[in-house]
Regions:
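Active-site nucleotide/adenylate-binding loops and adjacent lid/helix of ATP-dependent enzymes
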Residues: 67, 76-162, 170, 212-213
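Conserved N-proximal alpha/beta basic substrate-recognition cap immediately N-terminal to
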Residues: 2-100
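Short secondary-structure boundary/capping segments
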Residues: 32-33, 62-63, 114-115, 152-153, ...
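Phosphate-binding site of ATP-dependent enzymes
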Residues: 134-221
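Internal hydrophobic scaffold segments of catalytic domains
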Residues: 1-2, 180
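Conserved residues at the C-terminal ends of beta-strands
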Residues: 44, 104, 188
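C-terminal beta-sandwich/jelly-roll accessory domains of carbohydrate-active enzymes
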Residues: 224-225
Length: 225
């Protein structure tokens, strides 16, 4: 039925779940039941259709969603946002402004991809799946583009690689939106002489007051996913 039995496990100081073992005498909370009428599910890292990883979590969330549970965010939203190329396609369909982006399927396509971006180096190379600034690479020439794509495909022949125009900026902005309303925004300054602004790479976020255009574009982007 729609009522689900939920088990909870403690988390250690490093944020890792402590799963029970054969000799583990740790005490765990008793399982409890949830139902769609009184439960809000907040899911993180549910897996991707591109990379299996913890895909079982995605299936579990999809099952809950099909039974009427409310997820933040929805499974389809996770699917779109976990894949930068999928995200790019959805934004294009909804006329959301983004940097010019090309999918590069193999190293032989590097020259054509660079041409489509006007051969304006530097450019930014990204793996379609990734976070925390990992897999985001600064490309200064066609030669380095070709060799970098070769290396990525040697490590994973099925990896999707995106080539993107470089837009010089001192920061980026993250906006928190729920139910079509803006709850807040942070500015993430670029790190030193790096080109990335990820907090996990050392950027120190600060509060940010959105311009009217930033607010409207953020709301449109959120609505599209």
């Amino acid at each position: 039925g729609k009522n689900q039995l939920v088990y909870s496990f403690p988390v250690d100081d490093d944020g890792k779940v402590e799963l029970p073992g054969m000799k583990d005498d740790a005490e765990y909370d008793k399982p409890f039941r949830i139902n769609p009428e009184n439960t809000l599910v907040m899911a993180r890292g549910i897996g991707s259709t591109v990379k299996t990883g913890n895909l079982s979590w995605r299936v579990a969330c999809l099952n809950l969603e099909n039974q009427g549970y409310t997820l933040i965010n929805s499974v389809i939203c996770h699917d779109i946002c976990n894949d930068k190329w999928y995200n790019q396609i959805v934004f294009q369909q909804n006329d959301i402004h983004t940097p010019n982006t090309v999918l590069v399927r193999h190293s032989e396509g590097a020259e054509d991809a660079a041409k489509r971006l006007g051969n304006k180096f530097p450019m930014i190379l990204k793996t379609a799946v990734g976070s925390r600034g990992v897999g985001v690479i600064w490309i200064e020439s066609l030669k380095s583009l070709h060799s970098t794509i070769q290396l990525l495909h040697r490590e994973d022949e099925f990896v999707d690689v995106l080539l993107q125009e470089y837009i010089k900026t001192n920061y980026d902005v993250r906006v928190i939106i729920a139910s079509g309303k803006i709850l807040g925004a942070i500015k993430r300054p670029v790190i030193g002489d790096d080109f990335r602004s990820n907090v996990s790479q050392g950027s120190e976020p600060e509060s940010h007051e959105l311009t009217e255009r930033e607010a409207q574009e953020s709301l449109r982007a959120a609505a599209s996913v």
